[in-house]
Amino acid sequence: MQEILIPLKEKSYKVFLGELPEIELKQKALIISDSIVAGLHLSYLLKRLKALEVRVCVIESGEKYKNLNSLECILNSAFEMQLNRHSLMIALGGGVISDMVGFASSIYFRGIDFINIPTTLLAQVDASVGGKTGINTPYGKNLIGSFYQPKAVYIDLAFLKTLEKREFQAGVAEIIKMAVCFDKNLVEILETRDLKDCLEEVVFQSVSIKAQVVTQDEKEQNIRAGLNYGHTFGHAIEKETDYERFLHGEAIAIGMHMANDLALSLGMLTLKEYERIEDLLKKFDLIFNYKITDIQKFYERLFLDKKSEDKTIKFILPKGVGAFEIASHIPKETIIKVLEKWH
């Protein structure tokens, strides 16, 4: 069992990487999962969990259910179980479950503990660590949420055996995101080695990057923004396609392609660097046939991104390989020219 400490001022915790251990709790625990994950992995967790009382809340699977209705379902289950401030919630699932359970925990009785047990690669390397929680609204993605850290995170790679290839690749997109912005060495590992042979090493390294970034910038005031590479465009893509056509990681991959195009046009990437990042995305089949239906509407959606300030869109763009820059005040014409490539 490998451990990664995330030392924060208000709430430090550990990420455990290895076979899920027996978890003994002296309080009530509400497990929240989705309809697919519960069928695959709930019994595995229940065999390893001992608590004063355990109940399960199952919600529908998918990004489109990351909404107020599902949040209300979680909170109602907590009230019906009579959870108190000493109780906790357990998130068993992917990024959608992790985000919603974290948010529910942050507002129930003004905050109770929760544990993340991520079952997708995307959630293991990204969503379950760092304390970003939230739900989507008709206006955009994650526009209601909070920064709220888990009590602990348990990453068991055995969960990934049931993942479809598409889900796995979506998680790889988030790994590439971190590598391109923060770690040249990880880029080289992804370029030169078979991921199946080094998956545990790559997951450990990805979580370590996330841990270092979150430790330095928990509330996303500066360096943590680098974790949003591809997200300004990606969130607009998800909204345009009603959260149904693409998985989150797939939309982020398309967003990274767009960000690369913008970085190249601004001279932040050389053609060689641009092609290197593009080739890495292609290696993992993160190439998609996507066309923007209405460029002006798409452009306007970019302003709903949480990073936007004073009617200015902020983009996280790669600056070479292993670094990034927060770019703002980019002329509309420059952005539109990039979008036209995808029209």
Swiss-Prot record:
Its cofactor is Co(2+); Zn(2+); NAD(+). Its EC number is 4.2.3.4. NAD(+) binds at residues 61-66, 95-99, 119-120, 132, 141, 159-162. The keyword DNA-binding does not apply. Its main location: cytoplasm. Coiled coil: none annotated. The keyword Mitochondrion does not apply. InterPro entries: Dehydroquinate_synthase (IPR050071), DHQ_synth_AroB (IPR016037), DHQ_synth_fam (IPR030963), DHQS/DOIS_N (IPR030960), DHQS_C (IPR056179). One of its GO terms (biological process) is chorismate biosynthetic process. It catalyses: 7-phospho-2-dehydro-3-deoxy-D-arabino-heptonate = 3-dehydroquinate + phosphate. GO terms for cellular component: cytoplasm. Zn(2+) binds at E174, H231, H248. It is found in: Cytoplasm. Catalyzes the conversion of 3-deoxy-D-arabino-heptulosonate 7-phosphate (DAHP) to dehydroquinate (DHQ). This is 3-dehydroquinate synthase. It comes from Helicobacter pylori (strain Shi470). The lineage of its organism: Bacteria, Pseudomonadati, Campylobacterota, Epsilonproteobacteria, Campylobacterales.
